[in-house]
Amino acid sequence: MGTAKPPGRGCGALPRWLLGAALLLGLRLCMELRHAGSGPPGRRDLRGPPRTHLLPAPGPLRGTRRRQVTYVRSGRRALPRGGVSTTPPEPSCCAQLGLPSRKGPRWHIELQPWAGPSRSLDEEASRFLNYIGTTQIACDRMGTNSVATDSGPALKPWLVCLDDRFGLAHQIRTKQCRLYSLGLGSDDTHFEVSMANGGCEVHRFDPSVRSAHVLQSQRLWHHRLSIDWRDPHPAVAAQKPYSNTRKLGSILNEFGHHKIDVLKADLESAEWKVLENLILEDVLEQIGQLIFEIHLHWPGFEVSGSESSVVRFWYSLLKELERKDFRLFHTYKDLSKPQLFLKKDIFNASSCYTLSWVNTRWR
């Protein structure tokens, strides 16, 4: 008699644990197939940083500005990899809209040819003295203001040209005239007071003034400032933010003045370097009339070289004024000063002259 087999234990039946494992394997396979259409597993989570955070490629990009600090004196721009720049130079930063761009700075004036083949002092002095002793334009009305023409103007050193064609008389009458007076401790303010009384706004710069800014009358200011041919060194300026030495162009910017109808200067032998600075920085274009006292008994501050080369430099400066359309309308030889020319009693020259120019393009 055969024995009966227990249910589920036949040859065709599978163990329960094997069925469970097969079921789990099938579920895992379904999940893998579902993700197969969207790429490999986990690809969505492997994103890189946003493009805005990527570092720029080496070299400047067209139309973009580089955020880097450069020195003003550096005239070179960094080249991209390879050593050759293919990008046009970018315009200078922070140019004011609506204003013409300034020309590049000049570093020296153009020296005139020598007066003669021997390059001697006699040749240079003869040319120079003849130049400052000969007026280049006639002025029918000269004086210290437009109210009344001074008597005997040829005997006075500080005079302005009041011809209507140059516009100064009109500016004074309409109270729109501005005069800058540069000096070093002079007590003679007759010219400045007369111009202020006539209707001109006068700013007198003198380092000997006790207070920083003094208003003497309605139109006459005194400023404790000295005009130099260079600004203070940045290190000095940082320690002394109220230093009393400035270039004229810097003072014009600080005061917000765009034009000077008359510039008078008595700088005791600093006039040559100051005049050179006005020429090199194109400040002359902002000046209507120029009255300078020049000193000839020595070369002047920071003017060096042989005697003939010094006189050639002086002459070249005055020729630069002529190139800027300034014309000499009055010359005054001071006979009360020592009659010396570069420490020599020669050429019948005085050590001091006052020269007056008018800007013929001034409007």
From Swiss-Prot:
What's a Pfam family in this record?
Methyltransf_22
| Name of the protein in question | Probable methyltransferase-like protein 24
Provide the transmembrane region boundaries: none
One CC-aspect GO term: extracellular region
Q: Which GO terms describe its biological process?
A: methylation
Q: What is its main location?
A: secreted
Q: Which UniProt keywords apply?
A: Methyltransferase, Secreted, Signal, Transferase
Which purpose does this protein serve, as stated in its record? Probable methyltransferase.
Enzyme Commission code? 2.1.1.-
Q: Which family does the record claim for this protein?
A: Belongs to the methyltransferase superfamily.
Subcellular localization, as worded in the UniProt entry: Secreted
GO MF, one term, reads: methyltransferase activity
Q: Where is this region: Disordered?
A: 37-62
Extent of the signal sequence: 1-38
